[in-house]
Amino acid sequence: MPSGCRCLNLVCLLCILGATSQPARADDCSSHCDLAHGCCAPDGSCRCDPGWEGLHCERCVRMPGCQHGTCHQPWQCICHSGWAGKFCDKDEHICTSQSPCQNGGQCVYDGGGEYHCVCLPGFRGRGCERKAGPCEQAGFPCQNGGQCQDNQGFALNFTCRCLAGFMGAHCEVNVDDCLMRPCANGATCIDGINRFSCLCPEGFAGRFCTINLDDCASRPCQRGARCRDRVHDFDCLCPSGYGGKTCELVLPAPDPATIGTPQAPASAVVVPATGSAPHSAGAGLLRISVKEVVRRQEAGLGESSLVALVVFGSLTAALVLATVLLTLRAWRRGICPTGPCCDPAPHYAPARQDQECQVSMLPAGFPLSPDLPPEPGKTTAL
């Protein structure tokens, strides 16, 4: 029993690792535990050292992954007969027990669990599983990383499985990613491999050039003017008395004498420079004076008065023409302004009745000629 251990009813109450052994007694708890590879636990079981296992800590732990082997010391993998390899996973009789070569291939054992297959003409692969089909016969024609597929060589024809961004029978065509015109606002689309990029014009940004840059962000307007953003430009709404692109100019106050009076454009008057200045290199310069020529409105009809006159004359002419037309229409229908004989009241009778109207051009009360007596049954009206 190791020193430092206290045994009670075959239970080791305390065991210090590395303690030396003493002669065992019959009642020691070490009678059922390999004390060279472990010690007794408080529950009466053996507590094994690292690399050992078992009920009595009598068995070493093999290397992880060891399949057909054993060990004499921890972490070993000693292969059983017929097996080889680091993990004892190679069958030394694989050529006879498993026949790994297909399609008539011959298996050759290389030792250490390794083998190779001698394939018949037209087949290839580690196990001669692949036939020299259309892909191999065509020299693997798929381009741009495309994968040639022919069902392990047993298909009649090959097909190319293209990577993203390519198309065609041999994956030889680069798909135009700019075909759908993804770039906005007149941007230039640059095609890539399964991607595109937009070259934005000035004033725009973003992947698709859809973001209008704020030209007012730098606050270019002065005098407290309000800035209005445009496409790659801006406008300043200047307060009264200021002008210019950024309201940097102070406008002169208007002359009260010229307010409301149409003015002609200002004219530049060139006046030769005069004075007693000594002659120098700049003596030949001209003095330019800008004077504003104001022309007052001459007497006569203005534009608005002329328009009103034309409209009034047109309405008057239309009214006169309508009166003449109505008068002519009434005259053609035989309507007399005076006299009942020209417009008799409607009379309904079972028989026909003729009536003749005689109009005299003589003054009222003038007797008719005796030679023209009225006809019987006729009515004479003066």
Swiss-Prot record:
Glycans are attached at N157. GO terms for biological process: negative regulation of Notch signaling pathway; regulation of fat cell differentiation. Residues 27-58, 62-89, 91-129, 131-172, 174-210, 212-248 form the EGF-like domain. The chain crosses the membrane at residues 306-326. Residues 27-305 are extracellular. InterPro entries: EGF-like_Ca-bd_dom, EGF-like_CS, EGF-like_dom, EGF-type_Asp/Asn_hydroxyl_site, EGF_Ca-bd_CS, Notch_Cell-Fate_Det. Residues 1-26 form the signal peptide. Disulfide bonds join C29-C40, C33-C46, C48-C57, C66-C71, C79-C88, C95-C107, C101-C117, C119-C128, C135-C148, C142-C160, C162-C171, C178-C189, C183-C198, C200-C209, C216-C227, C221-C236, C238-C247. One of its GO terms (molecular function) is Notch binding. Keywords: Calcium, Disulfide bond, EGF-like domain, Glycoprotein, Membrane, Repeat, Signal, Transmembrane, Transmembrane helix. It comes from the Eukaryota. It is found in: Membrane. Regulates adipogenesis. This is Protein delta homolog 2. It comes from Rattus norvegicus.
